[in-house]
């Protein structure tokens, strides 16, 4: 005889004579497909049996991010876009970007690798919510302005969409001569004169004529 599963609340489980049994989901069912469970009952010590079918209605498709904004240090770092969903597939698309690579894959329930825009193996969302984790490498910010990128996460349904905003702090100002990291240079003007070129590399306003 099948036992009452842990996801169902069933009170009481035993009794004598006429009674009412209260049946409910322990937690709201989150799968996209109805869940049907059969539970058998019997008279103690005899062969009389009954069967109850409990039908938990499917939940709407959803995506629930753990957060809608992520702040990133100016030096760049690896971040994780995480949340929960019951969608058959998830598609990650940059709506605005500043050079971050496309999100082509992500982890489901911490172990299964899924491909953006492709049905997830085993369709875990059919029977309940799952976790997703997309790893994103944000490069160093070399400009002196904060910058933002927006990542859209879309499910199978056209209205199942969430947008994540990633904001990176402004980078440091720099001033180099002829090559990155070089702060000194010698310019030699030949005998008789002759224009020479000094290459300036910077991301900020600079001057070689300081104010007095």
Question: What is each model feature region?
Answer:
Residues 26-34, 126-130, 138-146:
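Surface-exposed, short loops/turns at beta-strand junctions within beta-sandwich domains
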Residues 46-53, 147, 158-165:
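Extracellular and select intracellular beta-sandwich modules with Ser/Thr-enriched
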Residues 1-22, 62, 67, 87-135, ...:
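Surface-exposed binding patches on compact interaction domains or structured appendages
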Residues 27, 43-45, 140, 155-157, ...:
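Surface-exposed loop/turn motifs at beta-strand-loop junctions within extracellular Ig-like
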Residues 32-45, 134, 145-157:
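A short beta-strand micro-motif common to beta-rich folds, especially ectodomain repeats
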Residues 52-60, 85, 164-172:
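Interdomain boundary/hinge segments at the C-termini of tandem beta-sandwich modules
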Residues 57-86, 175-203:
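Beta-sheet-dominated interaction scaffolds and their linkers
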